[in-house]
């Protein structure tokens, strides 16, 4: 599972406009990745943790598989951030980072970065960047550079808060599931521990034992947490997802009836948990 804009880029734009063939595969299962490789496969792209299911793919094993078959590996590292996970050190050829999210960290600038060997980046710069115009504005670049200075401090707090919130959510009777790689019962927790050296990031997903109307009412009760898209900001953001999503067939079954993606901010963890608690209480979910 990957970010919906990337999903559409791979399945629609590149396919329809440029004739690039794409195979969608569950990259948490190395055998499925192996089975999907074709003689003309040039690139394997993964996102780990995955958006929005928090699935974990084994970067080292997929890198070995890609290189054994003459392909390159790119890793979208947005949910982890470079503070927690460094894919190139694990064998990836490219790391893709959304500068908009954790690296900037304040929700006030947009940008992206590709990290890799100079021989590849020179081609990207000479062809894609110049011809397609994917260049960041000077002001956005300045904001992101300013925000990046505090990345380690912020990520430590995101990591700590998200784990506390995930553990709290596991105790709430009205919560149907919690997806967070830092929880011991996450199906790929052992892989996450190995490749996410400093923590598991600030994003988690959870479902409610409730109907759609309850989801809608729940967010209206929140006072500290903001109901909004995006993630990786200093403030906590929550968004309802899952219904009418073309990627739903890729989701585990528990995600099919809708769920919240929760980007846990750097507010005091007790304030975040209390905000959730009082909202749950108003909907008789605790």
Predicted regions and their residues:
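PLP-dependent enzyme catalytic core of the Aspartate aminotransferase-like
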Residues: 1, 10-12, 16-17, 35, ...
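Conserved PLP-enzyme active-site core in the AAT-like
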Residues: 1-174, 179
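Generic non-transmembrane alpha-helical segments
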Residues: 65, 164, 168-172, 217, ...
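Short acidic, gly/pro-rich beta-turn/loop elements at beta-sheet edges
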Residues: 122-124, 214-216, 272-274
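Short N-terminal helix-initiation segments at or just after the protein's N-terminus
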Residues: 141-151, 200-210, 280
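Conserved C-terminal alpha-helix-loop-beta "cap" of PLP-dependent enzymes
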Residues: 177-260, 264
